[in-house]
Amino acid sequence: MKVISFLEADSLKTFFKKFNKVIVALSGGADSAAVLQLSSQFITPENILAVTCVNPHVFGYEIENARKIADSLNINWKPFTVQYSADFLKNDDLRCYYCKHEILKSIENIRKTEGFDAIFDGTNIDDLNDYRPGMKAIKEFNVISPLKELGISKKDSLHIAKSSFKTIYFNVESCAATRIVNKMITFEDMLKVEKIEDILRYRYPGIRVRVSENISVEFKNKVSLKKSDLEFLSKIIKLHYADKQIKINY
C-alpha cells in the first residue's frame, strides 16, 4: 500500500530498516494501527509481532480491532494480560504510569523470550504537548515511538489508519479506567462502563460515562440532545447503576 504523500518513502525506509525483528504494542486505536501499517511496509511481516493487553481497562471493541488489523496484514497477534498493581487501583494522578509500566514490563518479557530487537508504540508527535505520566514508562523500557520520531501527528496517524483499514471503527479513545473518578478502580466499574458505552457509542460518538459518587455523562464532540435522548441515556445507565444520580452534560 502506498504511503500517504506527506511522508517521504526514503525517510520511512531509513527509519524502519534499522530494525530486523520488532514487537508493536497494538492497542486497537489509530496510532498503533498506523505504526503497524508503516512497519509492515519495510519490515518482513514474519519478523513483526503485534501484542495487545486484554485486561478489563481495554475496551473489547479495541481488542477486536487489534486482532482484525494484525490479521489483515498477515502479522502474528498475541493477546496478553497483566496483574494490576495496588498503585494502579488506588487511582491517583500516576495511574497511567503504573498501568503502562506493567504493560511494558510484560511486553519486554515477550521481547526477551522471543528474541525481538525492539518494541514500537503509538506515541505521536502531538503527545509531547500533553501531560502523559505513561511516557516515563516508555523511557524506562526503551520503547521506540516511530510516529514521534518521524514527526507524525495525531491527525496524520488517523488518516493512515482510516486509509489502511477501511472496515475498522477508529475512535479517539481513552481506557475504561479513566472513567472512574475520585474512587478506587474496580473490575466491576470498568465492566459496567464498557457495557453502557458499548450500547451508546455508535449512537453518541465520543460519549464518556464517568463513575464517582454519582454518574456524569460527557461528550467529546458537541451534541444536540432531545428529551427522548436524555430518557434513553438515563434508562441504559440505570440498568447498571440504579442507585446513582445521573448528570448529563451537553
Feature roles, as predicted:
Residues 1-163, 231-243:
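ATP-dependent adenylation/nucleotidyltransferase module used to activate substrates
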Residues 9, 104, 186-193, 197, ...:
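Generic alpha-helical secondary structure
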Residues 117, 148-152, 158-209:
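Mid-to-C-terminal catalytic subdomains of enzymes
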Residues 134-136, 207-210:
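Short, flexible, solvent-exposed loop/turn segments with mixed acidic/basic and small polar residues
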Residues 210-212, 241:
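A structural signal for short secondary-structure junctions
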Residues 213-230:
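A short interface-forming secondary-structure element
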Residues 245-250:
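Short proline/glycine- and acidic-rich turn/helix-capping motifs at secondary-structure junctions
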